[in-house]
């Protein structure tokens, strides 16, 4: 869902991260603004997170202090209540936050044999720890269902070659969220999963705009 008033990509400059946290739903109550990582929101005077407005981002929130526990990814946009940023139903608590660094791979003027691997987003997910077993490789695409692509295995290790991604426990971008920044995750504990289950994945793009959050409750 792109903003209606975007500059051409070639002229856009990445904005400094900025997020507003409201203690009540629908952007009511005391407001606290952050422009950098906060390992404990209570130490910053935030008693409760009821709604969130991301002016520039993206960001990741955590259930526990020191960026631990369940993860919640926030892109630029409005999140009026907790079920607009998650549908895992396990927790509505956010205790720490940090900005996500979105690193773009350099674009090449022409696709050649030498530059064909310079994709902006590339991730490989493996069945077993230490990058073994069956795998699914995703390049410059969002995948709402691994099963639809013929991959029905567990995901125990992940290698992010470029871009920033968020994986989900269930198809359709539902369930627990797992942030994947560039690098290697040798087993599921390294990306914060209690069980090696990921069934959908999408790219994080800092110019994306969510008017009412990433989730749309049926009620």
Swiss-Prot record:
Annotated PANTHER family: BETA-CRYSTALLIN B2, BETA/GAMMA CRYSTALLIN
Gene Ontology molecular function terms on file: structural constituent of eye lens
Region described as C-terminal arm: 207-219
Recorded name of the encoding gene: CRYBB2
Free-text note regarding domains: Has a two-domain beta-structure, folded into four very similar Greek key motifs.
Organism encoding this protein: Gallus gallus
This protein's name: Beta-crystallin B2
One Pfam family of this chain: Crystall
Region feature Connecting peptide, mapped onto this chain: 102-120
Residue numbers spanned by region N-terminal arm: 2-16
